[in-house]
Amino acid sequence: MKKVILYSAMALATTLGMSSCGDDFLKLDPTGSVSQGTLSNDQGIDWLLTGAYASMNSMTQTGWMGYASLANYVYGDVMGADANKGSVANDQTDFTQLETYSFNSSNGYISGKWNGIYEAVNRCNAVISMAEKIRDQISDADLIIAQAKYIRGVWMFDAIKNFGAAVPFINVEAYESGTDPLVSNVDESGNYIYIWNLVEQDFKDAIAGLPETWAGDYGRATSWMAKAMLAKLYLYWSSPYNGNMSSADHWGQARDLFKDIIDNGKDAKGTKYQLITNYGDLYNASSPDCDWGGESVVDVQMTIQGTQNDTNAPISTWAAGQPGASGMGGWGFYQPTYDFVNSFIVDDNGLPLTTTQARAKDRLTVIKTVVNKKGEPEDLPKTDLTVPVDPRLDITAGRFGVPFLDYGVPFRFGGWVRDYNNGGMYMNKKYLPTIADRSSGLSVATNPVNSAKNLHLIRFADVLLMYAECLIHDGKYDEAIGYINQVRGRAANDFYKVDDYAGLYENLIKSETNYTAADIIPSGLTMDDKVNNKTVAGTASNYRVGLYPTTGNTEATATTALRAERRAELGMEGHHWYDLCRWGIAADFLNGYVEYEGKFFPNKFASYGKNWVMLPIPFGEIQRGNGVIVQNADWQ
């Protein structure tokens, strides 16, 4: 059983400075319901610190739809063209607005995200403030403060990613003063105040004050986690966006930190950072490699405590479960897009098609009229499993005709897709628990999504790809491809084989009595492994993986490889929209996506704004601030 940090409801309820849902989270209030005397010891301050850690994955804070969580599936995936909202059209209309690019600054999810960030920041400031006040009464105030600054840095970096770098930074002095009006994001001349350097300092302080590992408390912050967050901050700070994020040249600092992490870094258990052997084990709670097996760089630790209310879902929402396939109900949100799935189609060399080529293809899954053994026609979702794809697709997305964890083999819509006319014909997969997890203490029998698998915020594969991006900036294109190929090569190790899921196929044959085994079990399919120069027969789909050429690369070829690899490797992990925005290509890419995906969902999408590289600051905050908080440049 893995050691976990328990995110107790009591810690949440007693955190100083925590506001209730619907409050103005920038109206600072350092007073709380617990006296200083109660917290003026090691147990009390750690209790308070636990409340700050809990902000990193708490559905109490983030709303049961997870719109404020660090998983960022709503923004990184759904706004980033990797996922549709799912469910039905009239469910969660604020979510629909984000999915279809028809939102504005009054959107409830956007307000919830803003409030969630600043609630978490207030929790961190409560810890720092109290630790300073009782420094002489606790064992190690500096260690407590370093952890709180790390968490505050994580959340303020999340604020930058979502709302831009000109947002209020709430430090402990502002928190203690309880000032009203709000903390401003502009100076006296009306110029934006960019907070990059303030978040940078939080991570630097955390690096200086945190240990490399902990003895058992694996979810606590370490200096290596802080280094990874700082390196990623430098990468974003250096990225072009659309010229309105006060970007600066920190490529060298990012590069050096990433190289240090690659060469010397170790995870919370002291394991040197590495790519684990099998990609799918990253999302298999029963695998020792799932969490802290060497690939976890920045994880949010999960725990199972036996009931729905005491248990977290890695993406902070209970709504992403399939509607019945796991043996219990589900809402059917968060479905991979046709565009995303097509991006896994590969060419004869096992390399991804260009975006233009992939969008020229039809969907891999379509409705087909099939004739059963009684001679009766029936319309069913059918996937063309002969088209060669990157095997990471079937670990990331559920496809009809391919085994889905231990749930079964999807054959018809019932139990799998709630409304394919709204969300498409694919299912999310990575962060769902298996049915077997319920009996092994890794999930619960009361909810289809809750799981003990960690939320991976930064994996070692991500570090390798971000380092490659720095090398591309330095003009070292062939060297960058070497790191990209490390990530791509691992994909050849893990794929679906028919014999491994014989029981699931047999169950489907027994239940679908009007169809023969030949209608259900694929045959003649292979894994064409060009990485290791071998072919494996008996696979559930045609798979193919090859490596990028290692010589003669240009900025264009290396950049294309990097961007394709980030989408494939990190798909459905909350990254893609942020990548598109910082690269300055969001409008072009997403309007192309609207054109392609919109063919299958007529009149669903609006166009994506040409300057949108961030969300608007919520209208309510602008209104309450009365000029103190100014709307960001994208949304003026």
Residue ranges and their predicted role:
Residues 4, 8, 14-43, 199, ...:
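Bacterial Sec-dependent N-terminal signal peptides
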Residues 41-50, 54-59, 86-163, 184-218, ...:
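Conserved, well-structured interaction surfaces
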Residues 160-162, 167, 236-245, 475:
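Short coil/turn linking the two alpha-helices of tandem helical-hairpin repeats
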Residues 21-74, 368-373, 385-387, 618-636:
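Membrane-proximal, proline-rich intrinsically disordered regions
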Residues 21-22, 45, 61, 78, ...:
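Long, intrinsically disordered, low-complexity segments
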